[in-house]
């Protein structure tokens, strides 16, 4: 908790959105909604090349910023992403990281939906079970994952992915419902 508070103060000094923090240094971050052009510019200065917006009710400013691509994956507040949302996010991270680019995820407050997507990443990438992913994430972002629906989605994701290493398996084989469009 102390680390999170210290980072939050440093982020204000850098003009980053409230709650910005790296969960994988210079690869993956979570944040609350960027509300100004200055926030977007600060994200780019911090090394973020892709911003994933989960909140249809509070999108980031629409002003184009050089070096920042914004992807919308709308999820209602306190709801959980579905398997297609997870798949889009994983593919985006895979492509960005292959190019050495960092990704940041936001919802309105940077807690529930953002935390759910970040925990899903750890389930997918590090083979964590849902509970371990949330516990690990909460060491960095204490208020991550806010609803039972969000936790249940993470449990289902882990059940689908299973304990096998999936980093080299096509996503269409991990999430079978989606195989038609992604494996052709």
Please provide the spans of the model-predicted regions.
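Conserved G/P- and acidic residue-centered "switch" motifs that form tight phosphate/ATP-binding loops
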Residues: 110
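Ser/Thr-glycine-rich phosphate-binding loops at phosphate-binding pockets of nucleotides
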Residues: 114
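Short cysteine clusters
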Residues: 107
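Cys-dependent protein tyrosine phosphatase-like superfamily
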Residues: 1-103, 117-184
């Amino acid at each position: 908790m102390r680390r999170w508070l210290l980072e939050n103060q440093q982020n204000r000094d850098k003009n980053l959105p409230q709650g910005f923090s790296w969960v994988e240094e210079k690869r993956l971050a979570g944040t609350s909604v960027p509300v100004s052009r200055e926030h977007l510019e600060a994200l780019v200065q911090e090394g973020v090349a892709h911003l994933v917006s989960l909140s249809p009710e509070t999108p980031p400013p629409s002003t184009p910023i050089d070096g920042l691509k914004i992807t919308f994956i709308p999820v209602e507040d306190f709801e959980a992403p579905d398997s297609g949302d997870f798949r889009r996010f994983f593919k985006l991270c895979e492509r960005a990281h292959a190019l050495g680019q960092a990704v940041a995820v936001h919802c309105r407050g940077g807690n529930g939906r953002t935390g759910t997507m970040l925990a899903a990443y750890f389930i997918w990438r590090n083979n964590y079970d849902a509970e371990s992913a949330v516990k690990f994430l909460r060491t960095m972002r204490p208020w991550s994952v806010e609803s039972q629906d969000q936790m249940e989605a993470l449990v289902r994701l882990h059940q689908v992915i299973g304990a096998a290493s999936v980093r080299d398996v096509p996503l269409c084989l991990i999430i079978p419902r989606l195989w038609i469009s992604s494996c052709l």
